[in-house]
Structures are given as structure tokens and as C-alpha cells.
């Protein structure tokens, strides 16, 4: 397994709309394993393939406190949304930034697992929010898109400044 490089805002590749996985192959399973390793190494609770410059509909999530209950969602689809919720969200692709984002309180999701078997589940609380956040990535959308242009530009400028500083090292 490998830790993959996580793209950071405002990288245009984060705006790519992911394509469906046509067949779950050993190569797709390797991508899933690498994404899980990357998510754990970066101390995230979710990761979409577009964040690691792989433009296929793959998401990994683990919201467990013990970090040993990974979920794999291939070609995920939200088939129902209920209620309203929102928490202050962060993102591995927008380091250091957090913002309150309106989300559905509960979702029903259909996806394939790492073996290509279809399954469906209901999610609420943090899992529902995480699923919606990661599926936004697959559509080329970031949580900063929910913010005002002023706030979004402040975050962009801050991250560009950090990037320039790191490049000088």
C-alpha cells in the first residue's frame, strides 16, 4: 500500500467530475487500499478519489474512534435525503480551514463495496455529513463552495501563501 499525495485547494484537478467505476478489478481494490492508507496517514475521516488525482467514483470513510471500521463506497449514490443539519467541516484538501455547511440530517446511500457487491445503508449524524462531503468531491465541489466569495478567497489566499512559503524552503 502507498500513501498518495492529497491535492489542495485551489488545484483545478479537484474540480474534475469523477467517472463511474465500470468494474471492480484488483487495480481498483489497490486504489481503495492506497486511499485508506492515505486517509489514516493524514488523520482524515473520509477521502474521495478526486482528492488524490484519481477521477473515479470511489470514497473511503472511517468515522470510528478506533479507526478500524473502514467503509468503501464505489459508485456511491444518495438515493434519499431527510431533514437538515450541519457542522463545522474541515477537509484534507483545504488544510486549516473550517466552515459550517448545511447538509441533510439523514441520507440513504447505495454503493458497491471493495468486492463489487451492491449494498445500501442509512446514515445520520457525522456519517451522513461525511458521505455528503465526499460525494461533493466526486462532483468537483468543495465545502468552500458553500461559503461567500470573500471567505472562499481568504482561504485561497492563505493556502497559496503557505504553498509559496513551503516552495522557498
From Swiss-Prot:
Query: What does it catalyze?
Result: N-terminal N-formyl-L-methionyl-[peptide] + H2O = N-terminal L-methionyl-[peptide] + formate
InterPro entries (alphabetical): Peptide_deformylase, Peptide_deformylase_sf
The primary gene name is def1
- What are the alphabetically sorted keywords of the record? Hydrolase, Iron, Metal-binding, Protein biosynthesis
What lineage does the source organism belong to? Bacteria, Pseudomonadati, Pseudomonadota, Gammaproteobacteria, Vibrionales
Q: Which cofactor does it need?
A: Fe(2+)
The active site is formed by: 134
| Single Gene Ontology MF annotation | peptide deformylase activity
Q: Which domain of life is it from?
A: Bacteria
- GO biological process assignments: co-translational protein modification; translation
Q: What does this protein do?
A: Removes the formyl group from the N-terminal Met of newly synthesized proteins. Requires at least a dipeptide for an efficient rate of reaction. N-terminal L-methionine is a prerequisite for activity but the enzyme has broad specificity at other positions.
For this protein, the Enzyme Commission number is 3.5.1.88
Please report the name of this protein according to its UniProt entry: Peptide deformylase 1
The residues that hold Fe cation are 91, 133, 137
Signal sequence region: none
Similarity comment text for this entry: Belongs to the polypeptide deformylase family.
Pfam families membership: Pep_deformylase (PF01327)
* Cofactor comment: Binds 1 Fe(2+) ion.
| Organism of derivation | Vibrio cholerae serotype O1 (strain ATCC 39315 / El Tor Inaba N16961)
